[in-house]
A protein has these predicted regions:
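Positively charged, low-complexity terminal tracts
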Residues: 1-114
Length: 114
């Protein structure tokens, strides 16, 4: 399980949501796991903004992201017009996770346009 801190633009409080679809052992992640992490982080933001709403399709476009170093590992941050989501820390090399996310996002842009 992975906790994601979510803040919806226009609100004054953040919430923590839990992702169960991704193994917490980041050292064993594949690009499919990274894709699922990003997808679930975006869906966590959507669910916080629209609780009880229908789950939208996620195409991994229209957001900014960064991987940052923190004691104990790295964090993944996503920002878009709707708000922000942050997950981690993950026990993984910052450069490796950055490269994996870049490949996953680039592949999504190639498939769906950007």
């Amino acid at each position: 399980m992975i906790d994601v801190d979510v803040w919806v633009r226009g609100t004054s409080q953040a919430a923590t949501r839990t992702i169960q679809a991704v193994n917490g052992d980041a050292a064993s992640w594949t690009e499919a796991d990274v894709r699922m992490l990003l997808t679930e982080m975006l869906l966590s933001l959507e669910r916080e903004k629209n609780p009880g709403g229908e789950t939208p399709e996620v195409s991994l476009r229209g957001f900014s992201w960064i991987v940052s170093q923190q004691d104990g590992g790295v964090l993944v941050h996503i920002e878009m017009q709707m708000g922000t989501a942050s997950a981690g820390p993950f026990a993984m090399d910052e450069a490796r996770l950055t490269e994996m996310i870049a490949r996953v996002v680039d592949r999504a842009i190639q498939l769906f346009g950007g």
